[in-house]
Amino acid sequence: MRTLTLLSAFLLVALQAWAEPLQARADEMPAQKQPPADDQDVVIYFSGDDSSSLQVPGSTKGLICHCRVLYCLFGEHLGGTSFIHGERYPICCY
């Protein structure tokens, strides 16, 4: 019984020691800066030729595109480029 109590106490101390650095790192992270309300311009460029399906009404039915941070997900294709606050991001469609 003493062994179980000792092991439980050791486990709790180990968990507490492991959790403290995580909390310290979370406290050190700066809050994400929010853009001003009047700075919401988004420029989007689509790749492709002039006869692309983006100009034909109804042909884009069911096409869903997202501006991604780094790269397109599995099953998506690169549909263009977006610029948000001067940063370039891929537009991925499926």
UniProtKB/Swiss-Prot annotation:
Ubl conjugation as UniProt keyword: no
GO cellular component annotations of the record: extracellular space
UniProt GO BP: antibacterial humoral response; antimicrobial humoral immune response mediated by antimicrobial peptide; cellular response to lipopolysaccharide; defense response to fungus; defense response to Gram-negative bacterium; defense response to Gram-positive bacterium; disruption of plasma membrane integrity in another organism; innate immune response in mucosa
Cysteine disulfide links: 65-93, 72-92
SMART domains per UniProt: Defensin_propep
Pfam families: Defensin_1, Defensin_propep
UniProt keywords, alphabetically: Antibiotic, Antimicrobial, Defensin, Disulfide bond, Fungicide, Secreted, Signal
InterPro entries (UniProt xref): Alpha-defensin, Alpha-defensin_C, Alpha-defensin_N
Subcellular locations according to the entry: Secreted
Signal peptide boundaries: 1-19
Family label: Belongs to the alpha-defensin family.
Biological function: Has antimicrobial activity.
Note: The human orthologous protein seems not to exist, its coding region does not have a start codon.
Protein name, as recorded: Defensin-7
Species of the source: Pan troglodytes
Taxonomic placement: Eukaryota, Metazoa, Chordata, Craniata, Vertebrata
